[in-house]
Amino acid sequence: MKALSCLLAVIATAGSLFQHVDARSHARDRLNNISRVERPVIHTPSHRVHAHSHFDLTFDLYPRSSRIKLQLEPNHDVLSHDARVAFLDGEGNVDRMERIERRDHRVFKGWAWVQRKSGSWERVGWARVMMQRDGEDPLFEGVFTVMHDHHQIIPKTKYVHKRHPHDPPLDATPGEYMLLFRGSDIRTQTHDTVERSITSSPSCDADTLAYGTQSDFMFPPLPQENNTNLWGSLMTSIGRRQNSDTVGTVPGSQNLRDTIGNTDGCPNTRRVALIGVVADCTYTSTFASEMDAKTDIISVVNAASVVYEHTFNISLTLGEVNILPKNCPATASSATPFNQMCGERVGDESFTLADRLNTFSAWRGKKSDDFAFWTLMTDCTTENQVGLAWAAQLCVKGVQGDSNTRNASSQAVSGANVVSKTDNTWQVFAHEAGHIFGAVHDCDSALCQDPSNPDNSRCCPSTATTCDAGGKFMMNPTSGSQITAFSPCSVGQICSRMAKHSILTNCLTTNRGVDTISGQQCGNGIVEDGEDCDCGGDESCKGNKCCDPKTCKYTSGSQCDDANEECCRDCKFASSSTICRLSSGPCDPEEKCTGNSGDCPRDTHSKNGETCGTNLQCASGQCTSRDLQCQMHLGSQVAGSRTVAFDSYGCQVACKDPYRPDVRYEGSLTFLDGTPCGGGGTCENGQCTGSTFGNEVSDWVSRHKPIVIGVAVGVGCLLLLAILSCICGRSKKRRPRNRKMAPINMRPMPPVYNGWTGPPPNAESPGGHPQYNHVPPPINAPPPAYPGRMPSTRYA
């Protein structure tokens, strides 16, 4: 039984490692149109700008004859105060480490305006820009929106490098200049095929990777016989950007409609997510220098962060950048196994984007930082995949699984993703980060019509009654037009995950006490030493009566800032009876303001394992059980309210219908952290931790009572028979024999076995002794001396 217990423990542990889903992004489709950026003007006296400049930037779009104005200010959030760049050698060792100086990077944010025929200007969207060259002939890149249609500005060299085979050709104009394309210029997608070639638009294919028998982390669970394996993997990508390009724990599909547009759970005040980025050799090789690669990464994060700031009140901020040399090694170093040439052969197979994620995740798992996640930037693709991510791994440190094998059922899972370089890299970056935050794909016509997608459970629907989201949002499976924001369904999904603590948020810091690269910079949205408040500059501070945007001090009579402090009401501290964080149940008590501070006290939960109801225990702030989580996540596909957990051992959600006890239903979900699991342990990020061998044996016994009882009864019966046999044997030994004893002075005649003289007699004749032929002893034999009575002898 010890061996069996060990085997079951190994199986269950292995099964708990691979309940994650990864998602992939695919390259965009061809462009129908492309424009030249003409007559760019920096509106400063000398047409010069520095890292802390506030200015307007205007230009024309040819041949559309539109005049655009970008009203810009520094984006100090994009780099942390101690942001650093590590330049690695070919073996993956740090060659040198440098601090990223904020003054060296002219990174801006702001708003986009369009000039009307009347000459007036109308604000039409947001803008993010990285200035490469100022003066009278400026060069810049970035993205801005016009009525939710994103406009991408890229240098000619980048367009040429990533030009789609069917994109419009360029003229012979020499030198570097700027081009622009809109999301609406990308060819409209059809959904008559699932697999797309490199000429297809970028998509996310996490759904195409095996996760048990599923093809997407949100696919409905398939019934499995009890003897099937307990693990698998599901990976997805962004071009049909993501049928699936995420890997991780994902909430039950039946809840997506219930939370559409619900922002409960998302932060009410600004939070900062520090991230790390690595550029592999293929990515670095596309730039003239390693410094240019670093600059491009900053530009990508600058653009991607805006959708998180506007939607979730979370800034994506660079904490560390690692740059690998542009010359790819002949053989990847063990320190950086992900750093390989595109299409490199590993055995009989190519090194795919999934392999890069797997090996990069193992690398990230060894990092000891508190970053929200790490991203690997590469120039490689697998078919038309341009991105891949583990789902719902925000703030997760360490690694689960094994990266030493390329078997899809054995993977390394951590807070990591992979993004390929495209001409809209920022969008791929934002999409893959969405999966890290736990978002699934928006529904498109293909997913809505897929017979394996009952009740549209694999994706985020447009509304509670409409499936197809129309390809308008950030988590659309393919790149397309007007993709600049998250859908209401994605917003509700991510916020509800935060509210239910099904993703970690402990790495998201407030905007107070976050050192920025700019030091004491009023207007960067971060409250630093010496500042009372910082509402983010003149534009962001409009209507704020508590904070002076010029001095970052409270206005006269103000004690706090309503915009950034949860216990502030009309610029005064809220009373101690004010609830600043509502209770979500018996395991998550409400928090109240202190009355002498603008900050809400730390969110606290009841201890995991604490009883909160009949057969219910606290786990991650929720009053729940394994059965209840099964009903919540898989009930609609199994047996509704009578759905129960398949067993009490692992941390992957596996359920059953009590009337079909031998059929196992499982998906890509994991039980909440703190949920009890085998051996007296608790689930933590999909793994059963804290179990002991003794408890595992006890747990195994309790889970197999019929077998144990049967074996115990059988063994007990055998023992009873053995005892009875012994008792009977001893009783016969003590039974008196009706046998004549030899006289005390006479030597008994020893028997001599000469064989049977006739038919073999019975061993004992009735009322007498066995009959033998005897030979008399020698006549002169001296008699032996007997010490006493001879014991009886039994012959058989």
From Swiss-Prot:
- Which PROSITE patterns did the record assign? ADAM_MEPRO (PS50215), DISINTEGRIN_2 (PS50214)
Region of interest (Disordered), ranges:
737-796
List the transmembrane segments.
707-727
Chain positions recorded as Zn(2+) binding sites: 431, 435, 441
- Cytoplasmic topology ranges: 728-796
Annotated Peptidase M12B domain residues: 271-510
Q: At the top level of its lineage, which domain of life is listed? A: Eukaryota
Q: Which residues are glycosylated?
A: 33, 226, 313, 407
Which membrane topology describes this protein? Single-pass type I membrane protein
Q: What protein name does the entry list? A: Disintegrin and metalloproteinase domain-containing protein B
Q: Which gene encodes it?
A: ADM-B
